[in-house]
Every structure is written in C-alpha cells, then in structure tokens.
A protein has these predicted regions:
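Alpha-helical transmembrane segments of multi-pass membrane proteins
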Residues: 115-140, 158
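Signature of the first transmembrane helix
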Residues: 4-66, 99, 103, 165, ...
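Hydrophobic alpha-helical transmembrane segments
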Residues: 125, 155-170, 174-206, 211, ...
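Alpha-helical transmembrane segments of multi-pass membrane transporters/permeases
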Residues: 6-19, 124-125, 129, 143-169, ...
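Short membrane-interface helical motifs at transmembrane helix boundaries
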Residues: 97-116
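Interhelical loop/hinge segments that connect adjacent transmembrane helices in multipass membrane
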Residues: 1-5, 196-240
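Selective transmembrane-helix segments that form parts of the transport pathway or gating/packing helices
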Residues: 87-99
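Transmembrane-helix boundary and interhelical linker motifs in polytopic inner-membrane proteins
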Residues: 2-3, 34, 52-89, 110-111, ...
C-alpha cells in the first residue's frame, strides 16, 4: 500500500509539472495569436469555466475514489463498480443541467447585464458545452484514483491538454478567434472523456472485475448509495 501511494504521488507530481508547463504554452500561444481584445474575452470566460466545472462535478470524484478504495480493500468489486456508475449518473445530470443553465440563462445575463460585453456571449455559452464532458472525465479519474492507477489520470490529462492546445491553435489560426479557442477546449475534454471510457472498459476490469451474475442492486439501494456519496461530497464542494 505504501509503495502504491508513493508511486501514485510521484506520478501525479511529475504530471502536474508537465501540465503546468502545458498550460503556460496554451496561454502563451493564445495571447500571441488572439491579440489583446480577444484574449481578454477568453480570460473572462476561464473563471466561469472553472466554477461551472467544479459545481458540475459536485465534489463527487473524491467520493468515488474513497468508496472505490474501501470496497476494493474488502473485495466488494460489484459495489466498487456500482459506486462509479451511481456517481456518474449524478454527475452527468449535473453537467447537462448546469450546461443548459449556462447557455440559456447565465451567459446572457453575464454578457449583457453584468459584464456589459455582448462579444462575450458566445464564448460564455460554449463554456456550457464543456461541463458534460468534464464531469465524465472527473468521474473516471476518481475511479482510477480509487485503485491507485494514477498513470491513467495522467494519460487522460495528456489527451485533454494536447487536444485543447492543438485544436485551439488550429481554430484560432483559421480565424475563429476566441470562439475557436474555446471550441478547442470542448474538443480537448471530449477526447479526454473518450480516452477515460476506453481505459475504464479495456484496462480497469483487471482491478474492478465486471459485475457478477448474481449481483442485485435495487433502486432503493442506489438511492441510499447516492445519498452516501452526496453526503461525503458536500464538504468537498463547499471548500472547493
């Protein structure tokens, strides 16, 4: 266990350094290619992107990691897998709901009334398209953390960042400006979501076997599990 923790911490530490550099490269490229006005609009959207991603995740990725680790420790593989599925349902619902809210309500209010910048409307609306993909990625990263496979988290982050940098740069060069930069982010997260699903289906059965045939889990059981996950996630989302 200690070796797993040390190895996982080292992988995440190295990954964070690499992705921090990647983040600087992204901002540097966008600052050069977009110019002051368009880059300023992009800068306006980034805080709201972070806020909505945090709200959509609902503090559930740490809850997934905690309960998956606990169930796996006592060989309750069916419950570990069910924890992931139940949390994923909650997160996808939140991601879609908050995405729609951002597109049709929050973005217009922010652009016209709060910021007074109509040009920021479409970029802010695109932020709403990011959340459904980001929550899928977050849920599976929580699952990967629960079985101490930190390298899987790094792989999905690499796909996310490379996709975002390459697509955003290409779209901006084509002439789509801030909108193109944000579409690059959408594509980056969508590719990361696909990679996370692929890793979960292909490689995770080694650590969390597929459900046994005699495993039964009623709607009432799922509601109880959902309540447990949400109860754990509330302090996480408040502090986030």
């Amino acid at each position: 266990m200690a070796n797993k923790l040390v190895r996982g911490s080292l992988i995440i530490f190295i990954g964070n350094i690499i992705f921090r550099i990647g983040g600087y490269i992204y901002r540097f490229l966008m600052a050069i290619l977009l110019g002051p006005t368009a880059y300023g609009i992009l800068g306006i959207t980034l805080p709201f992107q972070g806020i909505f991603q945090t709200l959509a995740a609902g503090g559930l990725p740490p809850a997934i990691a905690k309960y998956v680790a606990e169930y796996e420790a006592v060989d309750e593989h069916d419950m570990a897998r069910q924890t992931i599925y139940t949390a994923l349902k909650i997160m996808v619902f939140l991601g879609i709901f908050l995405g729609i809210l951002m597109i049709f309500v929050v973005a217009p209010v922010l652009a016209y009334k709060y910021l007074g910048k109509p040009l920021a409307l479409v970029p802010l609306q695109i932020v709403g398209l990011i959340t459904p993909f980001s929550v899928i990625v977050g849920a599976f990263r929580g699952a990967f953390q629960g079985v101490y496979k930190m390298e899987y988290i790094v792989y999905t982050r690499a796909v996310e960042q490379l996709g975002m940098i390459l697509c955003a740069t290409a779209f901006v060069l084509i002439g789509f400006s801030t909108v193109g930069a944000l579409w690059g982010t959408v594509i980056g997260y969508s590719l990361a979501a696909v990679s996370a699903i692929y890793i979960f289906k292909v490689y995770m059965p080694k650590y969390i076997p597929k459900p046994s045939e005699n495993f039964t889990f009623t709607r009432r059981d799922e509601l109880k599990l959902a309540g447990t996950l949400v109860k754990f996630s509330i302090p996480v989302i408040i502090t986030a």
